[in-house]
Curated annotation (Swiss-Prot):
Keywords: Amidation, Antibiotic, Antimicrobial, Cleavage on pair of basic residues, Cytolysis, Fungicide, Membrane, Secreted, Signal, Target cell membrane, Target membrane. Belongs to the non-disulfide-bridged peptide (NDBP) superfamily. Short antimicrobial peptide (group 4) family. Its main location: secreted. It comes from Mesomexovis punctatus (Scorpion). This is VpAmp1.0. Transmembrane segments: none annotated. The keyword Secreted applies.
Length: 76
């Protein structure tokens, strides 16, 4: 076989070996982002924060006063 016929095979082997060599490093770089994504699953989103977080902003009492006021109005 002539050497010129082996050049495409040689280039394909270089590409395959380079890809296989860099794949573990690519997967290792994905681990921190996957961990942070898993940690964010249990956290509340910003959109629901203002509705869920009444106790922290001390709005529970205001909500109760509003509910009492609405009850008084509905009685009349």
């Amino acid at each position: 076989m002539k050497l010129i016929n082996l050049v495409p095979v040689f280039f394909v082997l270089i590409i395959v070996v380079d890809y296989c060599h860099s794949l573990p490093f690519f997967l290792l770089s994905l681990i921190p982002s996957a961990i942070s994504a898993i940690k964010k699953i249990g956290k509340r989103s910003v959109e629901s924060q203002r509705y869920v977080d009444l106790n922290r902003r001390d709005l529970e009492q205001d909500l109760q006063e509003l509910q009492d006021f609405l009850d008084q109005i509905s009685e009349h």
